UniProtKB/Swiss-Prot annotation:
Keywords: Acetylation, Cytoplasm, Decarboxylase, Disease variant, Heme biosynthesis, Lyase, Porphyrin biosynthesis. It comes from Homo sapiens. GO terms for molecular function: uroporphyrinogen decarboxylase activity. The modification N-acetylmethionine is found at residue 1. Pathway: Porphyrin-containing compound metabolism; protoporphyrin-IX biosynthesis; coproporphyrinogen-III from 5-aminolevulinate: step 4/4. This is Uroporphyrinogen decarboxylase. InterPro entries: UROD/MetE-like_sf, Uroporphyrinogen_deCO2ase_HemE, Uroporphyrinogen_deCOase. The gene is UROD.
Amino acid sequence: MEANGLGPQGFPELKNDTFLRAAWGEETDYTPVWCMRQAGRYLPEFRETRAAQDFFSTCRSPEACCELTLQPLRRFPLDAAIIFSDILVVPQALGMEVTMVPGKGPSFPEPLREEQDLERLRDPEVVASELGYVFQAITLTRQRLAGRVPLIGFAGAPWTLMTYMVEGGGSSTMAQAKRWLYQRPQASHQLLRILTDALVPYLVGQVVAGAQALQLFESHAGHLGPQLFNKFALPYIRDVAKQVKARLREAGLAPVPMIIFAKDGHFALEELAQAGYEVVGLDWTVAPKKARECVGKTVTLQGNLDPCALYASEEEIGQLVKQMLDDFGPHRYIANLGHGLYPDMDPEHVGAFVDAVHKHSRLLRQN
């Protein structure tokens, strides 16, 4: 620590590094915990802040993103913050129009339909320069966190971004995106390469701006079986990690732990554990003991309580957390949900989840 209390990048010195130590595989006094979508609509203060402007205008406001990121930290003793943003800012920066339709979700008025539509996309190298507002939000949030907990940056993985860009929004089948994989494999690889080339400088830029860890969301992994996943998703997941780490080294920046969360990607756990990430996130369909057997001690695991468990009583939440922590064990583990928090969840039950993780994980270490 420097004499003025600032860290090497001029940010306040980190006071709680439990999350980072667990991510790197070091011993911790208790199990760290954070929640995907912890900055979300289940919080009344979030709804109030968001009511002032539309979704992507909020994403482009560093002040609003900072405020939304900090809100859950004021309520709960979480061990990490994750910047408020959206994975679809990357397709926007590539030149695609994206709107957020209330009650429906993201919509692309002009999705990619033909191979020649790829010509509409901007050079991926300009993406980071288009997303300065995300970097500003990260820097502002890092300052205002005042070293309380680490700040996580994130992005969507190439396949998941491709699904939105081709489907034109969400889909229960991803049939249009998968049609590309079968009918236009070369164009699919071209698009996935464009996205990878856009993501690498974007993620590096987040670290330069102050992010202390990075999570890559492969939210639509489950729409691919092992064969398609290994061909169209895994190579790019690997490449993102490899290139981000190389660029950080070249820039003389300290490495940050990287997390891969491939929802419903249980069939690829072993491959994901060897993809160059320090942490593998799990959804609730994976049994913790089986996951640990599969990946061994090579990576930290993160997850994986069913988000709907938070509809249970606070007492039952405590019991479910105890079982989860017993199954994962105290080493190389970060507690989280198996997916994001839902808008109708009770903040009190989120607090019960966080408190139960801290309480039981301390007891585990005493025994």
